[in-house]
Amino acid sequence: MFRLLTHKMMESVKTASVASLVSLLVTGCVTSIPRSPENVCGIFEEKRGWFLAAKRARDRWKAPVGITMSFIYQESGYQATARPERERLFGVIPWKRKSTAVGYAQAIDATWKQYVSDAQNAGDWFPKYRSNFYDAVDFVGWYNNQSQRQLRLSRTDAKNLYLAYHEGWRGYQNRTYEKKKWLINAANKVETRARRYQIQYLKCKKKLSRWYDFLLFR
């Protein structure tokens, strides 16, 4: 009897340990910025949980890893708690922020709410946080998937996907970005980086992959 109880206790400990490990790997570190942000392989070697998250978004949304990661870089510089600067009242006093954007993907409140609602309708009731890399990268994949459907954009068209991401679907249709030279320049940077990231990723994804990776996806 004692041996049976001991065995069950050990199994419980093992299960809890595996669950903790999975959570740690998939969530990744939400406080530190990658040491080599220009090299996606370096990022994934440093933060393997991010590799798993980006690969999961690719499989789920058919989202090229290079594009997804380039969006995150452009939006937050890989800062988990990034937020827009505050406006200045009378040019001096810190005032309200320019938008409700928060986290890695700089998702605003309304769009994040829609993303969570869609996930729940699909049966995914896990809590979602904009400071969680797994959730943020999945959000980018979801958003770009919506852009493909609504705007008929190619999943590999990083520039126009980013313009739609920044301006919103209606804003993109109204071509509001045409009056924003700085935004077009940013979209060009996203496109260039996405292309470089994708080339890097294709060279290292096999080395980074493990046979048991499928067990780590929730």
Task: Pin down the residues of each PLM region.
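Export/targeting segments at the very N-terminus of extracytoplasmic proteins
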Residues: G28-L89, N145-R152
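Catalytic and substrate-binding regions of cell-wall glycan-acting enzymes that process beta-1,4-linked
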Residues: K96-S99, T156-L208
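Short, aromatic- and cysteine-enriched interfacial helices/patches
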Residues: F2, F90-I93, W211-R218
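Alpha-helical segment that forms one wall of the substrate-binding/catalytic cleft
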Residues: Y104-N160, A164-Y172, V190
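Second-shell loop/turn segments in exported
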Residues: N39-F44, A54-R58, P94-V102, A122-Y134, ...
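Glycine-rich, phosphate-binding/catalytic loops in enzymes
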Residues: E87-G91, K181-I184
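Sec-dependent bacterial lipoprotein signal peptides
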Residues: M1-C29
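Extracytoplasmic and endomembrane cell-envelope/extracellular-matrix remodeling and assembly machinery
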Residues: V30-L52, R56, N188-R218
